[in-house]
Amino acid sequence: MYRSAVFLLAALFGLCLASAPAFAAVEISFYSRELGGNNFPHAFIYLKGQPDSGGPPIDKSFGFTVKSLSPAVLMGPVGGKVMNEPDSYVAKSVRQFTFRLTDEQYGAVLATIEEWSNKPQPSYSLNKANCVHFVGKVAQAAGLRVEFRKELMKKPRSFLLAVKALNAEVLARSGTTPAAIGTNLPQSRP
């Protein structure tokens, strides 16, 4: 009798767990890459997880860059594109901060990425629409305060550190632990 009751309770508990919604969330990470070797300074984001409301999971980076590198970028607007950074590039970059997005914030981030993907060409401007501007607009879509200070718009790391400082309380409340802020990830994806 006792075994039957235990089995029945275990089965009911299992059914409750199976019918409960799974906890899922999309995390956004903001990365920078410094000048060195063949690398230009760069900023990009990484999205990983699944929306709480369901939908397909995401595990992808997004950065804004020139379509073709040439001296023309120094003279004025050139063709620009949103691209996915290779895993090897992500692994050699510095994650400045990560936090969980609500489904609403996630939708706004995706809309911003889509907007920048469909900008009329030429869309990249070193002074008005570069990778730092892109991650700044994504950060705003994610609900962060952003100051587009001219002296930081060509300095990805400094810009992201300024965004992190402006939003320290928000980042702490939304799941970023102090130890995770500004640390590198292992060689695998975030």
Describe the residue ranges of each PLM region.
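Bacterial N-terminal signal peptides that target proteins for export
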Residues: 1-9
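Sec/Tat signal peptide C-region and signal peptidase I cleavage site
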Residues: 18-24
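Glycine-rich catalytic cores of cysteine/serine-nucleophile enzymes that process amide/ester linkages
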Residues: 25-95
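Second-shell loop/turn segments in exported
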Residues: 31-35, 93-102, 117-125
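Stable alpha-helical elements in mature extracytoplasmic
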Residues: 40-43, 93, 97, 105-112, ...
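Short hydrophobic/aromatic-rich motifs at helix boundaries and adjacent loops
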Residues: 81-85, 103-109
